[in-house]
Amino acid sequence: MVNTAAEMKAIVDRAVYPPVGSRSFGPFNAPFASLDPRDGFAEYYQRAKGGGVAVLPIIESSEGVKNCEEILAMEGVTGCFIGPYDLRLSLGVPGGIDGPEQVMRC
């Protein structure tokens, strides 16, 4: 769960290679993240460095919604997930799947 741009910055810093982040490169393990067994560490590094690492924060609090534009605008962020049930609770709306208009009002 991400609530602020500062939290997101710390996540991006650890998930993305320089110059955007400071993720270290492990040439012996990183290539195994590839679905193509022919890829070596050089191919993986180039793909990951060029935006091939998905960084997807989960927004599931009222604070996260309040700060979502700043969170999602950060370089290195590639999308997001919404945690609807925890978000409902954070907004003071009882749990369940009904009443989306209640959540939108909050």
Predicted regions and their residues:
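Expand to "…catalyze enediolate/carbanion chemistry for C-C bond making/breaking, isomerization
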Residues: M1-C106
